[in-house]
Structures are given as C-alpha cells and as structure tokens.
Amino acid sequence: MDKVQQQADLFGKTISPFVASQPTNVGGFTDQKIIGGSETTQPPATSPPSPPSPDTQTSPPPATAAQPPPNQPPNTTPPPTPPSSPPPSITPPPSPPQPQPPPQSTPTGDSPVVIPFPKPQLPPPSLFPPPSLVNQLPDPRPNDNNILEPINNPISLPSPPSTPFSPPSQENSGSQGSPPLSSLLPPMLPLNPNSPGNPLQPLDSPLGGESNRVPSSSSSPSPPSLSGSNNHSGGSNRHNANSNGDGGTSQQSNESNYTEKTVIGIGIAGVLVILFIAGVFFVRRKQKKGSSSPRSNQYLPPANVSVNTEGFIHYRQKPGNGNSSAQNSSPDTNSLGNPKHGRGTPDSAVIGTSKIHFTYEELSQITEGFCKSFVVGEGGFGCVYKGILFEGKPVAIKQLKSVSAEGYREFKAEVEIISRVHHRHLVSLVGYCISEQHRFLIYEFVPNNTLDYHLHGKNLPVLEWSRRVRIAIGAAKGLAYLHEDCHPKIIHRDIKSSNILLDDEFEAQVADFGLARLNDTAQSHISTRVMGTFGYLAPEYASSGKLTDRSDVFSFGVVLLELITGRKPVDTSQPLGEESLVEWARPRLIEAIEKGDISEVVDPRLENDYVESEVYKMIETAASCVRHSALKRPRMVQVVRALDTRDDLSDLTNGVKVGQSRVYDSGQYSNEIRIFRRASEDSSDLGTNTGYYPSQDYATSHEYESESRAFNTSHRNH
C-alpha cells in the first residue's frame, strides 16, 4: 500500500501543473494549484478510478478527504456534471503543454504552488489544450532513468469500459510496476483549428462520467503498447491519414467530373428539346400557311355534297377546319378523270391546283408572245388564248382585260371560287399568273367548243336531240351544285349557251365564273353593277339589280328554250316583236301544252327526230324557269329532277298551273331592258361573249332600242 501511495504522489507531482484549475473558470486556463506529493497525502474520496492496465482491470485508488478537488480544464460546451460528483484529481483530460517554457517553480513538499497560465487564443474554448503545446508535452511515462521524454506520436485510445473500476491489486502492482500513464490519460489527438469540418471529439473521460462519454469510432486504432512500436504505429496512422486524404480528393474529383458531365448532358438535352419544339412549330405553321386560305365570308367552300344526282363528287370537309375546301378531302381525280389539284404556296393561298403559279414568261412562251392567232374567244373581262403546256396538256388562258379595282375583285373572286369547286360539269382551274399589271387564269381546255357554237354556228351539222338532252341535264347539275352544295351558295350570274363548254362526248361543263358572286345569306343581294348578257337577264335583275339564285334559273330557262327551238336569245332577223326569244316562246309554249301540238316550238332542223315525251318535259321545265315572279320559279335541284327522271313534274309548278303564271308584257320587258342598259352603260362586259370561243352579238344596243321603241308603239296601238 505504501508503494502505491508513493506512485500516486509521484504521479501527482508530475502532472499537477497541467490539470489543476478552478471549476468555475471555464473560459480558459487560470492560476493552477499544484499539490505537492507527500507520502501521507491520499487521493480524494470522490475521484474516479484510473484506467485499467492492459492485462488486468484496475480499480480506482482509495479515497481521501484531505486533498481538495482540482479545477476542470476549459470546455466550449461543458458537460453536465452531477452535483454529487466533485471533479476527480488524478486523471484529468489530456492537456498538451503550452508553447512557453516549463513552470517557473516546482512544488516542494506539501505546499501548493500557484503557476499562472496564459489563456490560449483559440476561436472557441475547448476541453483540450491548444494544439501548439502537444509536441512540448513531457511524456509522463517513466523510463529506466525516471526521466520524462516528450511524446512524439500522440495516440488515441478507445473509450474505457463503462463499468466502475476497482483499485489495482498488490500483485499486479508488484509484478508490473506502476501503471503506464498512457493508460490513465484520455487520448490526446492533434487539433487543427483551421479545419472546422473535422472537430476533435474527446473520448470517454473519467472527469465527466457517463455524461462526458462520446462514442468512439469503430475505426479507432487499438491502444498501442509502451514499447518502441509507438513510432511505427504513429507512422502508420499518418500513412493512413494521407491515404484517406488522397481517397477523399479522388472522390471529390470524381464527383466534380460526374456533376460536370451531368450538367453538360442536361444542357444538350434541353437544347435538343427546344430545337425539336421549334421545328414542330415552324412545320405546322408552314403547313397551316400553305393549306389555309384567308378567311372570308364571301369565299367559303361547301361542307359536303347533299344533292343525290348523277355526276356529283361527294366531298367531306375536314372537322375543325372551317377554311378547308371541298377538294381537301376529295378523291385524287374528279368524275372526268381530271387530277385533283393540291394546295399551293402562300402567294397562291386562294388557289388549289397542282400547277398553281405560272410566270408571265411561261405563258408568253406557250402562246408565242400572246399572238392573236392563239385567241379562241373573248370573255367578260378579257381575251382567251389557247396554249400547250410543256408536258403537252392544252390549256385555256384567260387574260384580265382591265386592271381596275373592279376587274381585280372579279379576278380574285373567280380564282377563289373555281379553285374550290370540282365537279364533273364544271370547268377545272389549272393555275393563275400575277405579273405587275397582268392577271391570267389558266383553265383546263375543253376541246369541243361551246353550246352556242353547235346550236347557232353556220355550216355545222344539226345538234342531235339526244345530245341536247344530255347537255341540258349536265349543265343543270353543275349549276345546282353551285346553288345547293356550296356554302354560301355561288350565283353564276351569267349563265348562257356560250358559257357551256362541250367535251368530245358532248358532256356539258359550265365555265366562266368571272361574273360570279357569292350570296352568303338567304336574303337577296343588291348589286351595284348590273352585269350579264342581253336576252338572259332576269327581269328583276335587269330592272333593280336584285340578285338571287332564281336569277340563274331564269337564265337557264332561256338556254332550255334555245335547245328546244334552236333560236338565239335575241335575234334581230326575226319580225318585229319576235326578236326576244322569251317574248316569242311564252305564248307558244302555253299553247303547245294546252293543245298538245309542239310542232311550232321545236327546232325544225330536227325534222321530228326527237322523243316527244322528252320535248314536253323540257318545255314544261323551261316555261317554269322563265316565270316573271322569281318566287314562282323552281330551284335548280327541281330542274335536275324534272329533266333527269320520269317523275311527275308537279314540283316545278310551285302551285302555279299552266297559263296562270304572269306573262311578260312586251312593253314592260322593253322598259326593263332600257333600265338595265342605263345601269350598265359603262360596262364593257355587256353584249360580249364570255366563253372561250367567239360568237356574234345578238343585237347592238342601238338597233335593239329603236326596234323596242317601234314595238312598244305598235303594241300600244293594239
């Protein structure tokens, strides 16, 4: 027991300058009391036991009440200490030596010595001494000469077991000597104040009991022995630290490279997505621009075909596109085998043709400089040339005569209408040309001239009755398509025999939409410019300019009268009062129906080579079409049904019996013609042929006016 006491005294003399501090002074090191070791001094009763030796578990030394408790070293966050446990005196936390020289005085005997310690300049107060004092700390382990050596390699020990220590036995003390100081001290790790990311955490310390215990890492090295292997262990620790540092740097570099590659990949993907969206946007915009014509309430295509008559092509409008025309969903060819025309460029958004745009040079080349020898007719607002395209297809080129605003509107109207209308009995538009002041429309060339040519041409064979019936039915179907199946309806406004073209099979095709107008309401349209041809004008249109679809019905009735009688609409070679076909035919039609004698109204050139029932049917149809009252006239659908079927013709009468319809008064008709002439006096379209081919004017305005005046005088005398 005495030997143990001596070792304790020696231990107290050795480390007392580093562990004694006032308990209340936590901010830093202050004056320390060092108790000199005497053989009679006992450790305090409340001091915890010293750590066990490597071989056997040690017990805390016996307690004594004579020694006062030492002060605790400074701590940034002082652990909670139970009030019943005063601080121990033997095993304080590791305290590396100050950079200053050793204490100025040493303890002698039992008298305490006060040694001032300067406060360390640490950012936060720590439980451990400044790192600069670690290398100067004297090694408390005794060597053979009992000389303290500095600790070269600070080591860290695992936390001691939580079980209470028992005092060391005499056998262990006698056999092994005094316990090593390294086993009694907590680990002293080098502290780097410049690395806040790696704070030094103390292991379990006997000063704080359970409250001061910090869980030790599983990778902590095992306690080194007191032999010379400490240096090797320290070098190994440094090597491991360097290896860990290199691994951390490599891992950070890999993470940085991965992050950089990820950012680059995301950027490239974003750019590709943006380019894809932009491409889709521009493609759709281009398609919309190329396939959609400007919205106009006046030029809209039909939604579908509803008339169940032979020769119609049934189209269906695409849903959701109010501007799409009937041709958008039409078959590749029409009923005549003509190719379906596609949409064009933005310059030709109103055109729907396969060859949408022609240059002026191209048209000049195929017409040899628009030579007069290529002229095949003169239309309502220009000449018509025949040309051969480069692929050998013949076309009819209609030139706009005037560059006025009215002529341009007519040109645009015809382009927009014809490009959207495709029917077996309607002329197809091939293309157009706009070059400075020149405007051209290119139509499919119909080779067999016009109905006017075959009916009234000189030195020509007589047109057979069967062909006349076929022509009447075909023209009626084409006109019915314009009225019934285009929305809004299209009013041709210049139906006449010279605007009905014939192909090689004598199938009729209605042409010349230069004077066409659209009627977008059920109400009549008042035109500011009366246009048409003498002999075909409806009375209400000639007198007031009121335009309806029944105006076209009246004009078509005049065409039927031409087919029946073979006479011209206005023939100045006829006797006075009989120059107008309508005035001459109406009383004779009524008489033929009542008496059953049609010999006076049928074309004598046929020489009775006709079907009488068909003649009667056409006579009744023509009589209903030329009624004075527009409301009493049938619609074109009824006309088609009357001509093309064997059904009863009662629907043509509209409640009017034969002979009860108001008959034209010759004087009244002449007055209406004079009003019409004054309204359109400046129009160059009147009295001209609007088809492809030339035909003679039926009457000059001078002759017609003088004859009408003479006829009115004789009529009043009667």
UniProtKB/Swiss-Prot annotation:
Localization in the cell: Cell membrane
Phosphotyrosine, modified sites: 443, 541
Modified sites of kind Phosphoserine: 498, 527
Region (Disordered): 1-256, 314-348, 683-718
Positions of the Protein kinase domain: 370-649
Record CDD domains: STKc_IRAK
Top class in the EC scheme: transferase
Protein name per its UniProtKB record: Putative proline-rich receptor-like protein kinase PERK11
Known EC number: 2.7.11.1
Segments crossing the lipid bilayer: 263-283
Location of the active site: 494
Ranges of compositional bias, category Polar residues: 320-337, 685-699, 709-718
GO cellular component: plasma membrane
Topological relation to the membrane, as annotated: Single-pass membrane protein
Matches recorded under SUPFAM superfamilies: Protein kinase-like (PK-like)
